[in-house]
From Swiss-Prot:
Domain Thioredoxin: 2-116
PROSITE patterns reported in the protein's UniProt record: THIOREDOXIN_1, THIOREDOXIN_2
Lineage, broadest ranks: Bacteria, Pseudomonadati, Spirochaetota, Spirochaetia, Spirochaetales
Record protein name field: Thioredoxin
Matches recorded under InterPro entries: Thioredoxin, Thioredoxin-like_sf, Thioredoxin_CS, Thioredoxin_domain
SS bond partners: 40-43
Length: 117
C-alpha cells in the first residue's frame, strides 16, 4: 500500500532538497512517488493502478504519494508542473520522470525496464 509523504517524511526517506544541491536518494530500495491532487481527474484514474502495483511489488519497491496541494514545497523542489507526475527512483542513479496518466501495462513495463524486475 502506498504511503502518503509529508515534507518531513520526504526529507528523511527520499531526498533532503533543503540541504542537498545534488540528487542523493536516502532510501535503501527503489521507490516510486505519485505526485497528485485530489481534484485531478487523471490522478483519480491512476490511483487504483498505483495501489494495485504497490501491493504487487510491496516486497521490493517503496510506493509513496505526495499531495501537491498540501506539499507545495516538495513539488516545487522536484519540478512538478503537471499532474500526475510519477517519479521512479533507483537506489543508485538519477530518477526517471513520467508525466500524465499511465495505463497499468505501461506503468508495469516502466517498472520492469527501469528497475529490472
Amino acid at each position: 500500500m502506498a504511503i502518503s509523504l509529508t515534507e518531513e517524511d520526504f526529507v528523511v526517506k527520499v531526498f533532503d532538497y533543503k540541504n542537498d544541491k545534488e540528487w542523493s536518494f536516502r532510501g535503501d530500495r527503489p521507490a516510486i512517488i505519485d505526485f497528485y491532487a485530489n481534484w485531478c481527474g487523471p490522478c483519480k484514474m491512476l490511483s487504483p493502478i498505483f495501489e494495485k502495483l504497490s501491493k504487487k511489488y510491496e516486497n521490493s519497491i517503496d510506493f509513496y504519494k505526495v499531495d501537491t496541494d498540501k506539499e507545495q514545497d516538495i513539488s516545487s523542489a522536484i519540478g512538478v508542473q503537471s499532474l500526475p507526475t510519477i517519479l521512479f527512483i533507483p537506489v543508485d542513479g538519477k530518477p526517471k520522470v513520467s508525466v500524465g496518466f499511465l495505463q497499468e501495462d505501461a506503468f508495469e513495463n516502466i517498472i520492469k525496464d527501469f528497475f529490472g524486475f
